[in-house]
């Protein structure tokens, strides 16, 4: 069964450009991994100079997702990239969930 990684973020206006630059870099890497099906970024500006963002990445299977997760962690380490530190510095709030996808 397909696995869907769904991340939700609240991004301050002043952090938006840097956050998107880093997010798009991660997305470009994920697209190269075996088992990647599709991914999207959704964005909605709220009235408080913040942006609500959702990113999704769909994987063929649980195994493909797990392999991608490990590959992403290795790539972060290779680049010296720490997503948690970036989120703290940019004052981005986030939450992650992994869901099974099935048609309805």
Positions of PLM-derived features:
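Intrinsically disordered, low-complexity segments enriched in polar/charged residues with Gly/Pro
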Residues: 15-16, 27-28, 43-45
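Short amphipathic
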Residues: 6-8, 95-98
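Short, well-ordered beta-strand segments in beta-rich or mixed alpha/beta enzyme
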Residues: 3-10, 40-72
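An amphipathic, aromatic/His-enriched active-site/gating alpha helix that lines ligand/cofactor pockets
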Residues: 25-37, 58-95, 104
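Short amphipathic alpha-helical segments, especially helix-boundary/capping motifs
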Residues: 1-4, 15
């Amino acid at each position: 069964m397909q696995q869907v990684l769904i991340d939700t973020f609240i991004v301050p206006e002043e952090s938006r450009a840097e956050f998107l630059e880093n997010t798009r870099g991660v997305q470009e890497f994920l697209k190269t991994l075996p088992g990647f099906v599709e991914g999207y970024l959704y964005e909605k500006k709220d009235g408080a100079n913040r942006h609500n963002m959702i990113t999704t990445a769909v994987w063929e299977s649980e195994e493909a997702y797990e392999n991608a997760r490990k590959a992403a962690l290795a790539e972060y380490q290779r680049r010296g990239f720490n997503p948690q530190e970036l989120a703290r510095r940019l004052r981005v709030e986030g939450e992650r969930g992994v869901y099974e996808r099935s048609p309805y």
